[in-house]
């Protein structure tokens, strides 16, 4: 059952029985539909969308900080259900997703904006994000972002959210949606290449989704690596700080790569290291992977074919792509077919994912009366 309250959903991993098969996870379409209906109704109850405002009434925007958003503790199930609902709604013309707009100055900065809108829930979301590797030397985070929500019918501004939190939850949520269909259900060992924010959010999601027993962590920074290992141990998992990327990846059931992008990054990961049956999610545009090793995968899914067609440089050779996430969720293409297939999800980030998570957080914050209201 999908959980909509603000309490953190904690899976009882001791009750999970590992299946020595490649059975896909239940798609639970009717539950996702019910979830979406309740989400939409609660949004109507807590936003401006349930009333016609007169000319004298002031518009108030709800500001949701990173600290507050973390306190909402959205469940993994509610995150994936929200994303799956919007992916299905694309086929009924209730959701619109624009390809991301990107600016990449020659000094290594990465500037990006995404736009998505839906009729159910009645929300439009715009995210602006800036990444600068030089921020580290300034004592700043490398990424800053904001998400703005508007009513998709009236255009009334609704909220501004910390985009870093939305991006972390959305990215892990997209990976989880793909993993449900592309990974073996009995996956027990997860390898993390890159140990920052994305690794932490993926650990939390995948620990709920799979009967994990062990993680392996490899990254440049010992502080982040050790923090990830501690998080795994707090979940009751064995944690190994791997000395090399190959050591981490070999014999892992799940591989999560979230290597920071920079002009200096050179490929250092080889898909030929993967064991039969492994699933890889690449949140880093597949940049750290040797392109010549990609044909090892039996099935590669990307986030969005329409978006990919407009990108200057493809994530992977187009002839290696089996389809995108919307087609996968709508069962227009198959996921894993055998227990020994090597599968991968490679993605840039999908605007409707930002919409799904921001709308979900907005719903919970409104229902709980949280956030700072600011006059427009």
Residue ranges and their predicted role:
Residues 2, 22-25, 35:
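Aromatic (phenylalanine/tyrosine) cluster motif
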Residues 2-5, 9-12, 20, 30, ...:
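Intrinsic-disorder-associated, low-complexity terminal segments enriched in Asp/Asn/His/Tyr and depleted
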Residues 39, 46-167, 176, 183-186, ...:
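N-terminal ligand-binding/catalytic initiation module
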Residues 175, 186-207, 219-224:
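Glycine-rich adenosine-cofactor-binding loop
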Residues 210-231:
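NAD(P)-binding Rossmann-fold cofactor-contacting core
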Residues 237-315:
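Rossmann-like adenosine-cofactor binding region
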Residues 287-376:
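Adenosine-phosphate binding glycine-rich loop
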